[in-house]
UniProtKB/Swiss-Prot annotation:
It comes from Verminephrobacter eiseniae (strain EF01-2). This is Large ribosomal subunit protein bL21. Pfam families: Ribosomal_L21p. GO terms for biological process: translation. Belongs to the bacterial ribosomal protein bL21 family. GO terms for molecular function: rRNA binding; structural constituent of ribosome. Part of the 50S ribosomal subunit. Contacts protein L20. Keywords: Ribonucleoprotein, Ribosomal protein, RNA-binding, rRNA-binding. This protein binds to 23S rRNA in the presence of protein L20. It comes from the Bacteria. The keyword Ribosomal protein applies. GO terms for cellular component: cytoplasm; ribonucleoprotein complex; ribosome. NCBIfam families: L21 (TIGR00061). The keyword GTP-binding does not apply.
Amino acid sequence: MYAVIKTGGKQYRVAAGENIKVEQIAADVGQEIVIDQVLAVGNGAELKVGTPLVSGASVKATVVAHGKRDKVHIFKMRRRKHYQKRQGHRQQFTELHIGAIAV
């Protein structure tokens, strides 16, 4: 069984037992959270799509870790003006372990 969930402004296809990295969630490591923004639920033969959400569906997940993704380098330059600017950014994430998908 799999589900399409929405968290942090993005959509993820998840199945029970998977680990996924999502945008940072304000929760402690080891805490169990319930994601109720489920857009679709399927089990291979049948697919239930919500308008926009599937009513009564939820996904239980456990917070495994918090961290930062790889650095993205930003480089700005104006030709012939001797202007150069370098900047970097590391986006924070939360790693979740998907437990159960309830319909």
